[in-house]
């Protein structure tokens, strides 16, 4: 993969105000509408792909099948950020790539792209395949300045991207999330006064990808899905749900998480 907007690379030495300003510049360039040829049917998985056995395996629908790349991060000795990228085509893992970078930026909510982004760029730049979609463990538009990690990376490479987070960074659910939700439920996340987006704008969804049969005794929390770049909020939820197969997490980031664990 090739970086298209190098001016948005995480730069060393920026203070938090400069980082926030850079994120606003990225959000101004980001496209939160659909600009791709993807559908849930084209990227959907009937069964969870295997990580090792499928690597390099043949596909059933040929080269025309979309390439979906999952991205996840881990840390080594609290000093190095490690990023894992796993490319899937038509249910088979076709490539994996890793990147790393020093942890030079402290943890600040909303500024994770400057802490972890260099490792992500390193991993994605190592891929020989060109992704049709990035599925990033982290936020996209559900972000104080509409520029979470998925947006930052999507704009940097100008590739359709979605963010999948396990907790809600900001925004207000359109309906209560206190009680366990049935599988398949979606609740819109609307912009509020903690965000740069217009109040009430739908910036993503709480997506209940899976649920236990008796959620009153044991339940699964929803995912928080948001567009990163060149994908709308509704389509982002559609695409992520299509790749969740038998697990809560979408297959691309689930496999990237497993690979990241192997690297640390």
From Swiss-Prot:
Its main location: cytoplasm. InterPro entries: Endonuclease-V. CDD domains: Endonuclease_V. Its cofactor is Mg(2+). Its EC number is 3.1.21.7. Pfam families: Endonuclease_5. Keywords: Cytoplasm, DNA damage, DNA repair, Endonuclease, Hydrolase, Magnesium, Metal-binding, Nuclease. This is Endonuclease V. The gene is nfi.
